[in-house]
UniProtKB/Swiss-Prot annotation:
Highest rank taxon of the organism: Eukaryota
InterPro entries: Kinase-like_dom_sf, PAK3-like, Prot_kinase_dom, Protein_kinase_ATP_BS, Ser/Thr_kinase_AS
One MF annotation (Gene Ontology) recorded for this entry: ATP binding
Protein name, as recorded: Probable serine/threonine-protein kinase mkcC
Binding site for ATP: I622, G623, S624, G625, G626, F627, G628, S629, V630, K645
Biased composition (Basic and acidic residues): 45-58
Biased composition regions of type Low complexity, renumbered to the chain: 29-41, 61-70, 86-105, 297-314, 322-360, 379-397, 495-522
Keyword Hydrolase: no
Amino acid sequence: MDVEFTPSDTNKFEANITKQHQVIELNNQEEQQQPEQQEQPEQQEELKDNNEKIKTSEDSTTTTTTTATITTTGENSISITVTEANNNTNQLNKSTSSSSSLNNNKNEDNKSVTASIAPSSPVIESSAIESAIDSPYISSASVFSNATNNNNNTTTTNVVVPPPQLLESSTENITSAAEITPVTTTTTEETINIPKESIEVQKQLAETTTTAAITTTNSTQVTSTTVTNPDKLKCKMHRSNFIMTQIGGKKFTEMTLEQLLDEDDPQTGMGFKNPGPQGFLEYVGDTAPPPTPPPISTSNTTGKNTGKNSTTGKSEGKKATSNSSNVPPSPVLASSASPSPKLKSSSSSIRNSGAISGTSENGGGGNGSGTISKNTAPTTGNSTTTTTTTTSTTTSSSKDRKSVVQKQSTLGRLQKNEEERRKRKEQKRSRAREKPILIAGIEDLPAECLKMVKKSKIPEDKLIQHLNILLPILRFRTGYNLRHVPIVSSNNSTNSLGSSINKNNSNNTTTTTTTTNTNNKSPEVSTNSLDVNIINQNQNQTNSVQNNQINTSSNVITTNVIPTTTASQSSQAPYHPSHNGNEEDDYDDGSRLENAILPKGTVDLIETDRDVKKLYKNLKQIGSGGFGSVFLAKSTVDKCEIAIKKIAHVSAKAQRTNLNEIGFLNFCKHPNIVSYLRSHLVDDTIWIAMEYMQGGTLTEASQGHTFNESCIAYVAKGMLEGLMYLHAHNIVHRDIKSGNIMMTIDGKIKIVDFGLCVDANERKLVHMAGSPFWMSPEMIRGESYGCPTDIWSFAICLLELANGEPPHRKSSLTAMFTTATEGCAGLDKPERWTEHFTHFLNLCLEMDPSKRSTAEQLLKHPWINLSENPETMKKILAQIFIANVMNHLDN
């Protein structure tokens, strides 16, 4: 078998073995070996009997006895002999004995130390050998494995060392492995009864392990040479380097660095329980173990009689687990009850499978599955102390390295969000082209709409009362083509459409009279009615019936269905199966324009002949949204960094929207509006080049900083100056929100994203557009709107700075429904703010748009005079957005 001696072992085993030195003459050495050879046949017979018992007993276990003999010969050599015996019995009997004597003889050339250890591996219990090998005076070591019989293994290691006088003078290396003192003989015995149920569980565990099977051969001899380094045992240095380089000097306790690196104090120190580099890896806890090296098979001597007890395959795994009692799989330090000096042992966590495995799966370190349990029981005697030490190692695979979940890159996350947004839009467009869904009550809503209504927690009585407001909101959010259809029965009583239909059976005929209300403001029913069809479901016959005609047949139910249309519905084109053109624009989420509104820009503003690769260098994506993606680039023309907005330019709708934005950007020239440079058509994408503003959006600022009134007034002043410019030219932005307000580290406030801009002079605006939380009541209700709708949205932005988020942020349906029916509640904590601020907000949040203050009037309000100093605001904004700027530079 191969024996590996390494100083970087993970577990520190305190062996309760007393040591004595006995000087033996070279002439008597051969005489001592002869009795040992005569005892071997007796041991073989005994082992055969034990193997026979194992075959017939389910509770059989394995006992391993290892004898290590260290002999010093001559002036510069040490002979180390390790003998291991595996004995199978019905009970796990462990016996540890160690005896030695020290005779001061004139002949100092011959020294021998003999230790009998059970059960353990030579690697674990031979710290003295390890220390000798690790000595800086040792140049090489040779390991020989000689197989003797089926269950008796002998390992001899020859090491070249300096003279004893020089070896004794090197106390640092010697004491690190063993302190040799004359002590009394110690005998250790223990008997453990393993339950049958425990063996079954351990057998199942062994079958699932991935430990490499140990190669079995009749006789194997392996010779290796190891060259050690004097710095091999300097674990303190390794731990210190790890703390400073790998975890940035971070300490997990209040202890000093010297205390952390201490290996002797049981109260402190990273390496006390487990010395060596692996000790502090276990100490820090969250550090992953080192990579698992390829498993190394070891030679084990087996004969013909061990065919059924082979150490390979399932049988080997089952035998291995029989040695492990019900103990945790992590290493447990076994302390000694003996007051005698301890043998300082640093050993690997070895995974044994019936026989001794020479190499740890963790590569000589890490948290192995080996366990050491201890039971101590004092016995009466002259000078004998009985101690039981059990070394049990289970055959289980090493724990995999913790999977580190890496965050998605900014580019990947933005692309994913953009793809999801595109899919939602396509779904809404598809729903808008479907046949209208007639809604007479809440129960008629599609499942998705019902889910949104339930989540909003709006009282049902309010939903029923304002159903004509609820349906446009649901259509805006989901894309469903919902039509409000109030029901009026023949006796002038209102019935539910759903209940009327449910009353009809297969033999009934329904007569429906439909009227259309052309008045956009009045919900009253028109007296003009239309001819309707009487559909007989059984006979498929169609008859013409005049309005308000009542069929007196007992099998026929006649109902007058009179839908009333609101202003928002009056602008909708009637449904037709072949209408696939621009129907989708009437059931939009706010990202598209009405067909009747002509785009502000023309194709002459788009450059197609210039090579963008030469104009712009080092493009880096820094943002994404429903509008497209934004990139930071170096402009060779402008000699500065610019922002490039990329938008798809394929469909007619996209082309119209892009031309509209380019036209308004090209037209608007104001310090509080983003500066436009130029546009390019690249394949099927429009590139809009604009000034790059170092900073972030108002949304980011409100989430990461608490603004006082003076800072809010500063932002309000900049926004109002930009809005006053737009409104002076009858331009309605329609998408004023915190995400479209840029705040730079230079203290500038600028309005961006002009894709939904429209000229109010062209026609009366009734189309719902924009973002739900910032929409004005008149837009949600489907009434005509104009520049005052931007003032409402502007006030919501100020509330977002004051409250930290817009009103009703958890539900867009609740926000829109409450805004349309009740208005805005205002500040969350009015007592924290001045009366001037509250009055300013009230002027902006008037439900009646005609009473709402204009941007020019608001700029004259006394509250605006509280605006923060520009130099102070620069420092505040630079502090808020410095992380964004650095992130853009690093990407």
